[in-house]
């Protein structure tokens, strides 16, 4: 049998050099590492990795070729109280594997044991890693590098976006290929989108609990192999990576960036009763935050938390991010529960992973977006990320909903959120674009559901409606659920228009949830993470073309307003913004704090947003000048000059002079 040569300790993973494959694996506490390769008949052949450089185990297999299927068995102490859970009876996934063959199905053999090890061998049912070689031709691909100030983000799910699209060929709907189809690209261009933000596409698994209920993890926030592309979104799993890159190349040619939602905060191994896939069996003590009793710190709500302050884990995470940029040409990342990235264990702006990203010539040049919290004490870190990061601005989300749907927000607070939440983000040289403004996102109500439901309806998730937030700041306008009288439908439509206008004409970087622009509903489910069905798939046949046109007109209007595009903080007297009351006069202190919900926002001295968020029709006296209502609030060539606007209840309008 062929013997392994010592090989090299870098790079991590399995790499083919034309003559054979070099294998490397980090483990600081292992006593022995076996490489397990599987032939075409599934027969396993084991080799001890002979090289041991510091904490890196390595070996070189001559004559090995791309397509080779492999895994690891790692020997070491079983000492749960110390955080060590080595069990060589369990085949392990290479954390740096580029491709995975097989499905992660619930099986008792995937468990390593709790207090005592489970010595039943599981190689027969564990998916295998696959050695790959890359010869992809990027041709003349170049990243669009859209300035932050010009960026419009569209958050979407690979499958849900196109699975029901009638104009995309049936055989590619719901796949990476569909993202790059001309129909999809033309739609995004016409809408005005500059960046497509995709929910996780790295290899993930469905939790055993969901599988037992006949459900699956639809969103993908349960990663197994962070370097491997999720094959279920490919027309052919063997060509998944090329299909994904073809889509990125097509999007880039259209000037659209691609941002990946990436999960570095936890793994699919869940808590100690969860499955053993990889990290727990390779070096549990190094990869995870471990409590004094040997259990996990659960700062993510998912059972475990990756220790992104450990040097080896920082190297692993950094290499993963570089891989997606260098191999797939992605333009940036949205980091799930990103406060974990800064834990040491307390949150620090100079945490090791932040420093590594800052110092990396590759990662420091792409768009970085944080979901700036986790569930641990001190986990709410909105506004506290390093200057390279933009952040999801939940202050904006809650303020917009409260202002238009709950009617309980002072004008001063609303204006602060409209002005990129400068009280939160104007620090450390950050620009207004650091505020990622959103009204909705994948988690929570859709925009339509915000105006149709007062309460969540998550019974289909199998948790008796306990899951999902109760703080929705929604308003059903008098009837719970979809449908209703013409008056009800119109009032809901007006609220949607108001929320979209607030989102798309505010300072900061707007993020639109896919489907909100044509009225998608999840029927009140505000936590549809396990609903891979028509609840989450966008139904293009039922799309509201009127709402889509309204949204596109707002985005194109935004691009005409210098105050929103220049990405500079607004200062008193700089001509970017003036805040006026219903009589076109500056607001008094009392009006800011206690005044009626009527406001005029004059942008760049030419564009006026007139707001009447009261229950009554109100006359709004416009500032001096010849004002015309403009799209989407009037036709392209509206000749009507307006001096006084009869503002409908809960209404707004945009004028130009």
Swiss-Prot record:
Enzyme type, top EC level: hydrolase
Keywords: Carbohydrate metabolism, Glycogen metabolism, Glycosidase, Hydrolase
Leader peptide range in chain numbering: none
Catalytic reaction(s) noted: Hydrolysis of (1->6)-alpha-D-glucosidic linkages to branches with degrees of polymerization of three or four glucose residues in limit dextrin
EC number(s) on file: 3.2.1.196
GO molecular function: glycogen debranching enzyme activity; hydrolase activity, hydrolyzing O-glycosyl compounds
The protein's annotated pathway: Glycan degradation; glycogen degradation
Family indicated by similarity: Belongs to the glycosyl hydrolase 13 family.
Protein function: Removes maltotriose and maltotetraose chains that are attached by 1,6-alpha-linkage to the limit dextrin main chain, generating a debranched limit dextrin.
Protein name: Glycogen debranching enzyme
Organism: Escherichia coli O81 (strain ED1a)
């Amino acid at each position: 049998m062929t013997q392994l040569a010592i090989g090299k300790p870098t790079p991590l993973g399995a790499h083919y050099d034309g003559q054979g494959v070099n294998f490397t694996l980090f483990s600081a506490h292992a006593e022995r590492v076996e490489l397990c390769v599987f032939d075409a008949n599934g027969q396993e052949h084991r080799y001890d990795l002979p090289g041991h450089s510091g904490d890196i185990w390595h070996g070189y297999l001559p004559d090995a070729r791309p397509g080779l299927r492999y895994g690891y068995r790692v020997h070491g102490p079983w000492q749960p109280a110390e955080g060590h859970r080595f069990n060589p009876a369990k085949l392990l996934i290479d954390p740096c594997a580029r491709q995975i063959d097989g499905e992660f199905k619930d099986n008792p053999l995937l468990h390593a044991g709790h207090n005592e090890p489970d010595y039943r061998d599981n190689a027969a049912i564990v998916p295998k890693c696959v050695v790959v070689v890359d010869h992809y031709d990027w041709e003349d691909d170049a990243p669009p590098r859209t300035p932050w100030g010009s960026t419009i983000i569209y958050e979407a799910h690979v499958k849900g976006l196109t699975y029901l699209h009638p104009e995309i060929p049936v055989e590619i709907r719901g796949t990476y290929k569909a993202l790059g189809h001309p129909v999809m690209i033309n739609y995004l261009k016409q809408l005005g989108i500059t960046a497509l933000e995709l929910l996780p596409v790295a290899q993930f698994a469905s939790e055993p609990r969901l599988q037992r209920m006949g459900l699956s993890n639809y969103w993908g926030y349960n990663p197994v192999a962070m370097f491997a592309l999720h094959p279920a979104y490919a027309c052919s799993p063997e060509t998944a990576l090329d299909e994904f890159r073809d889509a990125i190349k097509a999007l880039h040619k259209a000037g659209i960036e691609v941002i990946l939602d990436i999960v570095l905060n936890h793994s699919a191994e869940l808590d100690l009763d969860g499955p053993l896939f990889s990290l727990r069996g390779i070096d549990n003590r190094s990869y995870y935050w471990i409590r004094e009793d040997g259990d996990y710190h659960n700062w993510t709500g998912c059972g475990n938390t990756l220790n992104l302050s450990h040097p080896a884990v920082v190297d692993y995470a950094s290499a993963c991010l570089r891989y997606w940029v260098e191999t797939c040409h992605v333009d940036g990342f949205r980091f799930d529960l990103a406060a974990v990235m800064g834990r040491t264990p307390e949150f620090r702006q100079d945490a090791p992973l932040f420093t590594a990203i800052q110092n990396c010539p590759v990662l420091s040049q792409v768009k970085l977006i944080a979901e700036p919290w986790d569930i641990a004490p001190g986990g709410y870190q909105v506004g506290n990320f390093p200057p390279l990061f933009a952040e999801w601005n939940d202050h904006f989300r809650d303020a917009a909903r409260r202002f238009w749907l709950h009617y309980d927000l002072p004008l001063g607070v609303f204006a602060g959120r409209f002005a990129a939440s400068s009280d939160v983000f104007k620090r450390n040289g950050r620009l207004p674009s650091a505020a990622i403004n959103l009204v909705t996102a994948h988690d929570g109500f859709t925009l339509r559901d915000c105006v149709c439901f007062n309460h969540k309806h998550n019974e289909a998730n199998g948790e008796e409606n306990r899951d999902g937030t109760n703080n929705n700041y929604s308003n059903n306008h008098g009837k719970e659920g979809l449908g209703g009288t013409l008056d009800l439908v119109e009032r809901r439509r007006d609220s949607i228009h108001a929320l979209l206008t607030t989102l798309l004409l505010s300072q900061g970087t707007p993020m639109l949830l896919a489907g909100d622009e044509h009225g998608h509903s999840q029927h009140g489910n505000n936590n549809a993470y396990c609903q891979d069905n028509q609840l989450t798939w966008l139904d293009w046949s039922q799309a509201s073309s009127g709402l889509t046109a309204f949204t596109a007109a707002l985005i194109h209007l935004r691009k005409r307003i210098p105050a929103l595009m220049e990405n500079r903080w607004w200062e008193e007297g700089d001509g970017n913004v003036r805040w006026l009351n219903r009589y076109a006069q500056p607001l008094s202190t009392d009006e800011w704090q206690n005044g009626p919900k009527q406001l005029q926002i004059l942008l760049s001295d030419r564009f006026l947003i007139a707001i009447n968020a009261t229950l009554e029709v109100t006359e709004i006296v416009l500032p001096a000048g010849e004002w015309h209502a403009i799209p989407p609030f009037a036709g392209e060539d509206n000749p009507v000059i307006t001096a006084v606007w009869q503002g409908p209840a809960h209404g707004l309008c945009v004028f130009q002079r």
